[in-house]
């Protein structure tokens, strides 16, 4: 038997993503599903595509988007086939997932959701987890050599923290998403610092004496 499910077009696919998968914009804090269990299980189902290329992980409050875009641009200019995953998007969901500056094709988004619909529903993936897995998978299919991956929220429990990067970057920390990440700079810094991994170099933005100790 099994399911018969056919997505007709890109717009319907987006409708599914934004409605069936809880989005932070719509639901607020309850949409924030910290933890790596679901994304780990789903990426395993995909064959762990995120392990097939080098990654650079970027977290922080201020400037992480700009830093991510600059890094991708520099890598591309240096001749590397480069993936870039950022959020949120301005006009089109596909702005989040770029290879050498080009957005993921609409058909790739449709095919991915159609193919993995059952598993995503079963695992109860959040909108961001789904987007992250799509990026990981598309970068692998596109034979990228290196991908710049920006965290969605925080770092420690962020879906992107599944990757083992060649370097982690933490830009300046500020008070944002305090209800989710903590209400003081050190607490937020601790969440962002969650992307730091043993034996992986880290580059940090402006040093702040308050975080020493």
Predicted regions and their residues:
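Residue-identity detector for glycine
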Residues: 1-2
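Short functional linear segments
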Residues: 5-60, 67, 73, 77-78
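ATP-dependent carboxylate-amine ligase catalytic core
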Residues: 29-36, 40-51, 77-163, 179-181, ...
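Residue-level preference for the first positions of well-ordered beta-strands
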Residues: 55, 145-146, 201
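Short, conserved beta-strand segments within well-ordered enzyme catalytic domains
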Residues: 57-59, 83, 203
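Walker A/P-loop phosphate-binding motif and the immediately C-terminal alpha-helix
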Residues: 71-72, 171
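Conserved catalytic-core segment of NTP-binding enzymes
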Residues: 155-157, 164-213
């Amino acid at each position: 038997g099994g399911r018969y499910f056919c997505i007709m077009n890109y717009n319907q696919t987006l409708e599914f993503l934004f409605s069936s998968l809880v989005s932070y914009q719509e639901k607020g804090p309850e949409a924030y599903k910290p933890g790596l269990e679901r994304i780990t299980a789903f990426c395993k189902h995909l064959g762990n595509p995120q392990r097939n290329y080098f990654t650079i992980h970027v977290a922080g409050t201020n400037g992480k988007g700009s830093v991510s875009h600059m890094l991708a641009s520099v890598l591309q200019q240096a001749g590397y086939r480069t993936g870039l995953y950022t959020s949120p998007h301005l006009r089109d969901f596909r702005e989040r997932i770029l290879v050498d500056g080009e957005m993921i094709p609409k058909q790739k988004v449709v095919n991915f959701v159609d193919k993995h619909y059952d598993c995503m529903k079963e695992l109860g993936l959040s909108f961001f987890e789904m987007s992250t897995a799509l990026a990981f998978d598309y970068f692998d299919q596109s034979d990228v050599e290196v991908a710049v991956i920006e965290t969605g929220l925080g770092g420690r429990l962020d879906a992107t923290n599944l990757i083992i990067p060649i370097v982690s970057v933490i830009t300046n920390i500020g008070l944002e998403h305090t209800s989710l990440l903590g209400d003081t700079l050190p607490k937020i810094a601790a969440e962002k610092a969650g992307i730091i991994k043993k034996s992986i170099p880290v580059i940090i933005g402006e040093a702040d004496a308050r975080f020493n100790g």
